[in-house]
Amino acid sequence: MSGRNRGPPPPSMKGGSYSGLQAPVHQPPFVRGLGGGPVPPPPHPSMIDDSREPQFRVDARGLPPQFSILEDRLAAQNQDVQGLLADNQRLAATHVALKQELEVAQHELQRIMHYIDSLRAEEEIMMREMYDKSMRSEMELREVDAMRAEIQKIRADIKEFTSGRQELTSQVHLMTQDLARLTADLQQIPTLTAEIENTKQELQRARAAIDYEKKGYAENYEHGKIMEHKLVAMARELEKLRAEIANSETSAYANGPVGNPGGVAYGGGYGNPEAGYPVNPYQPNYTMNPAQTGVVGYYPPPYGPQAAWAGGYDPQQQQQQQPPPQGQGHR
């Protein structure tokens, strides 16, 4: 027991080690043996005397030196036990103090941990806020880019609208001029209306004249057919007369010159095979409307006051001069 070396307690303690906290070291006031600790108290004077002269001095009790040595050793061990008890008490007090300090340190550590957790929560909140701000900033930047593109588009639209406005201004100017001309033309509308009314009246009169001429043409066409049949009959009779005259002339040449029996007169000279027909002494019993000559599809009859009957009857010429049937020339 005298050779024990009581140094500082080990660093590892119950409850774990905590960084930043160092347990206080309790140093006993004296340590037996070789340890380099504090200086022990001086021994008892009797022991000093015994150590100086052990072989020459006898114990007062009359004991031999060996028993006195054992007794001294027991006393020393008793003293060591007392010292160990004192050390144990001091260690118990130190343990209680360390335990209290540990509780305080744990409480402080918990407070620090809570503070660290709060700091971490605040840091996370700040990081989230910063992230949200960065996201909002990025969205705002994108919106700014979109707004820039839209502004450029708006500027292009403004240029187009400006050019369109100029074109519309020129068109409005032209339309104003056209409106002025139309206004001048509108002022002439009453005159044009009067002219249109006059033209309508003339057209109605022309239609009435055309209807009248249609009726007259139908009547004249029927009358012309009758006259045609009569003329054909007269032409046949004239041919017969010509044949008879030719036969009589032939017989007269054969019999010699004789007078003209019957007093027949020949027109155009003697010996002319085509005797001239006399002019028609009869005038037609209808008159021509001078407005009818300009009507499209109108064919005047092949007779009238200007027609002179001369020469033989030509059926082909009569067919060419014959007007179309009623209903085809007037539509």
Curated annotation (Swiss-Prot):
Keywords: Coiled coil, Developmental protein, Differentiation, Flowering. Disruption phenotype: No suppression of FRI activity. Residues 69-252 form a coiled coil. Transmembrane segments: none annotated. One of its GO terms (cellular component) is nucleus. Residues 1-51, 306-331 are annotated as: Disordered. Residues 322-331 have a biased composition (Pro residues). GO terms for biological process: cell differentiation; flower development. Residues 306-321 have a biased composition (Low complexity). The keyword Amino-acid biosynthesis does not apply. It comes from the Eukaryota. The keyword Oxidoreductase does not apply. InterPro entries: FLX/FLX-like (IPR040353). Belongs to the FLX family. Interacts with FRI. Has no transcriptional activation activity. This is Protein FLX-like 1.
